[in-house]
């Protein structure tokens, strides 16, 4: 008799987790992203909440969001190439997941005893930006995988890349390629050089710590330029 409450509890927890994960198979909707632009993302809202709870908000300073939506054709081919080469070189070939990269990340996480390395594709990063926070957990990764799968079913690769390049974080309050190009180089994303594009691309893994003029960005962008197609 004593085991029944434990079994009931386990059943309840399992059912709750299954429902919590399962709802992502149908909600939130994805199809509207084919023709409409998201006004904000869960990640942007997360950053704003961080700001509101931080020291600068206490000084009465509001977080300024810099973002200007542009179609993919108005983003320099060099930046598109740089981001794909740096972040997800199999982007045009996979269906949302790079299983070899995921295995390597899983192995590194296992060796470190914590969830550190990501191994995420551009599609996975877009799903995370749109609907989730940076929380690192197995449960969130499963939800992210479901939303990535749905993105790949609903949208073509060009649209996925366009969305990603318009919502990716490129600094404190700087989102999207157009805002990043204007903020750091004083020009439109359409007019970026190969060198400028490479510097922006290697900022993406750590946009709050890296700037185009930092030593690590110069070093990494130099390596990236050698890998980028001409």
What residue ranges belong to the model's regions?
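Juxtamembrane regions of bacterial inner-membrane/periplasmic proteins
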Residues: 1-230
């Amino acid at each position: 008799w004593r085991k029944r409450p434990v079994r009931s509890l386990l059943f309840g927890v399992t059912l709750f987790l299954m429902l919590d994960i399962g709802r992502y198979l149908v909600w939130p909707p994805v199809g509207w992203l084919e023709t409409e632009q998201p006004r904000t993302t869960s990640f942007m809202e997360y950053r704003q909440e961080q700001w509101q709870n931080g020291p600068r908000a206490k000084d009465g300073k509001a977080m300024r969001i810099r973002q200007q939506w542009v179609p993919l054709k108005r983003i320099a081919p060099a930046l598109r190439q740089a981001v794909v080469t740096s972040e997800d070189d199999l982007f045009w070939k996979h269906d949302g997941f790079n299983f070899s990269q995921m295995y390597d990340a899983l192995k590194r996480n296992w060796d470190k005893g914590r969830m550190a390395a990501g191994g995420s594709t551009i599609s996975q990063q877009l799903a995370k930006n749109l609907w989730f926070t940076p929380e690192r957990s197995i449960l969130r990764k499963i939800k992210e995988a479901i939303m990535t799968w749905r993105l790949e079913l609903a949208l073509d690769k060009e649209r996925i890349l366009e969305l990603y390049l318009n919502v990716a974080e490129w600094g404190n309050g700087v989102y999207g390629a157009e805002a990043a190009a204007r903020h750091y180089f004083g020009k439109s994303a359409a007019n970026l050089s190969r060198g400028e594009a490479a510097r922006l691309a290697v900022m993406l893994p750590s946009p709050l710590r890296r700037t185009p003029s930092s030593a690590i960005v110069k070093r990494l962008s130099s390596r990236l330029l050698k890998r980028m197609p001409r």
